[in-house]
Amino acid sequence: MKQTITEKIFSDHVGAQVYAGEIVESKIDMVIGNDITTPISIRQFEKSGAAHLANPDGFAIVMDHYIPTKDIASANQAKISREFAYKHNLKNFFDEKDIGIEHALIPEKGLVVSGDVIIGADSHTCTHGALGAFSTGMGSTDIAYAMITGKNWFKVPKSIKVVLKGRLGEHIYGKDLILKLISMIGVDGALYKALEFCGDIQNIDMDSRFSMCNMAIEAGAKSGIIAADEITKQFFKDKNLRAEPKYFYSDEDAFYERTVEIDMSALEPMVAYPFLPSNGKTITQAVADELKIDQAFIGSCTNGRLSDLRIAAEILKGKKVAKKTRLIITPATQKIYKAAEHEGLIDIFIDAGAVVSNPTCGACLGGYMGILGANERCVSTTNRNFVGRMGDRTSEVYLANSAVVAASAITGKITDPRR
């Protein structure tokens, strides 16, 4: 019987041919925690009486949500992870000296390779499927179990094939593709499914692939996945990889629950209106709605990569942020920040009137470094726009790509960057 890439990855890890719907216990290659979710896992780990991690080199803690800490509570929370990391001499512990948002930092460090099974106590762990791995978010107790045993149980997900055709136009990126898809199938349209992107995938760069897989969860998906190709292998080239990649590809006549086709050449930049990522409208519709904004935000695990900053800088160069608008730019990792500084992008942002912050998840989750007040409106490159997501319950978040956000910051209203 033919298999999808997801079924093949699980078969490899289980040591037997398995198919969608089967319950399996799989070896885990990398377990990821952060400063918010890891302390819960640590408490469960210690409660179990376990003395050692099953796979110390396959466990990473990334301090990214409230780092540097914003208050006493977050400082005490961070202290739990730090003490655990030092006690166990954790190799993959990333704190203020090497700060970054986990789903940008982990691939940057070479800790995910094709063919892996990855779990993380964060819903956007599905990001890493862009590298040809099965990657999904789990609860902190599940993470503790994997810390203790090196394994976890799964119901092998059915797959939805997303066939992409053509090429993306000017100022249209992976963010627009995934917003379009979610608008088509809804926030539960891929519930517990693997969203497998294929077709003319060679026309999509790696950063766009990360954005697409990152937001698979916003359609309810268990994972997003893209089989490795030359672009993937090029991404791996300058990395000190944790392991040798194993490349798997879906059989031509493998079973898919559904197939969705998207003509990339017909896409416009997309904007997801409050209060769901599925409320996608074209930029033409958004411009017609004359949506004034109070804040523009570029960053997050979805769109805080170097390509996003380059796109924003190209638009902002020589311009000024609108008088009544705030622009916050948050590079996803220190390496990205340093590269942006080297290329002169940080100067462009500051000269335009933007605030450039350290890498953090803070604004995206309404934690700090960009919280919205009552009735404020923000256009953002983040991944969620639920009620109160970035601040006050009466505030509004509109999701868009980096070009749309940069252009909107200049005009003070949601703007088409192509105009």
From Swiss-Prot:
Cofactor remark: Binds 1 [4Fe-4S] cluster per subunit.
UniProt keyword terms in alphabetical order: 4Fe-4S, Amino-acid biosynthesis, Branched-chain amino acid biosynthesis, Iron, Iron-sulfur, Leucine biosynthesis, Lyase, Metal-binding
Source organism, top-level taxon: Bacteria
Positions bound to [4Fe-4S] cluster: C301, C361, C364
EC number: 4.2.1.33
Enzyme class: lyase
GO biological process: L-leucine biosynthetic process
Catalytic activity: (2R,3S)-3-isopropylmalate = (2S)-2-isopropylmalate
Entries under CDD domains matching the protein: IPMI
MF annotations from Gene Ontology: 3-isopropylmalate dehydratase activity; 4 iron, 4 sulfur cluster binding; metal ion binding
InterPro entries: Acnase/IPM_dHydase_lsu_aba_1/3, Acoase/IPM_deHydtase_lsu_aba, Aconitase_4Fe-4S_BS, Aconitase_4Fe-4S_dom, HAcnase/IPMdehydase_lsu_prok, Homoacnase/IPMdehydase_lsu, IPM_dehydratase_rel_enz, IPMI_cat
Cofactor(s) for this UniProt protein: [4Fe-4S] cluster
Pfam families membership: Aconitase
Pathway field: Amino-acid biosynthesis; L-leucine biosynthesis; L-leucine from 3-methyl-2-oxobutanoate: step 2/4
Subunit structure, as described in the record: Heterodimer of LeuC and LeuD.
Record's function text: Catalyzes the isomerization between 2-isopropylmalate and 3-isopropylmalate, via the formation of 2-isopropylmaleate.
NCBIfam families: hacA_fam (TIGR01343), IPMI_arch (TIGR02086), LEU2 (TIGR02083), PRK00402.1 (NF001614)
Family named by the database record: Belongs to the aconitase/IPM isomerase family. LeuC type 2 subfamily.
Protein name according to UniProt: 3-isopropylmalate dehydratase large subunit
Source species: Campylobacter hominis (strain ATCC BAA-381 / DSM 21671 / CCUG 45161 / LMG 19568 / NCTC 13146 / CH001A)
